[in-house]
Amino acid sequence: RAANAYQFAYDSYMLVKAAKEAWDSGLLVHGLLQFLNTPPYIEFARYLGSDASITHTAAQCTRYRPGQYLMPHEDLDENEGRRYAMVINLSRDWRPDWGGQLQFLDGDGSVVETFLPRWNSLSLFRVPQRHQVTLVAPWAAQPRHAITGWWLAR
């Protein structure tokens, strides 16, 4: 199906849904979502993004295993009010030949920029912007882990 239409294959843990439905309350990652929505952090997001309309953050935990990917898309969601997308990379010692790279595309679909998912790095970009995560190679020795989210305005 991916040859003819937008597709993705990766594992996710939806932090906002988990918080609303009280899943796994003991997981430390729930504290991260709370932090990403504190007034000081939202002020930081507004400052960094030069966007006073940012009101909150939505996030998910993502894991890309060998053979998984995210096809080109723009993260546009009018109902959520996405302003910026963010990726907090959590994979140690990631190698370029393992794939899983965040790539930005121009209007013709050509790659114009590529970012390796380096440990403890933040990728932040304005939405909409065409991008993809390349296929994680079958020989990748570990999954690609990240916290992926959006700065929202409502």
Label each PLM-derived region with a short phrase.
Residues S12, S25, S50-S53, S91, ...:
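Generic serine detector
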Residues Q34, Y47-S53, D75-E80, W94:
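Short, conserved, surface-exposed binding loops centered on an aromatic residue
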Residues A59-R154:
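Catalytic core of Fe(II)/2-oxoglutarate
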Residues N37-S50, Y64-Q68, R92:
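Catalytic cores of PAPS-dependent sulfotransferases
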Residues H56:
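Short coil/loop residues immediately preceding or within conserved phosphate-binding loops
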Residues R1-Y10, F44, S53, W94, ...:
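Generic ordered-secondary-structure signal
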Residues R1-Y41, Y47:
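Non-heme Fe(II)/2-oxoglutarate
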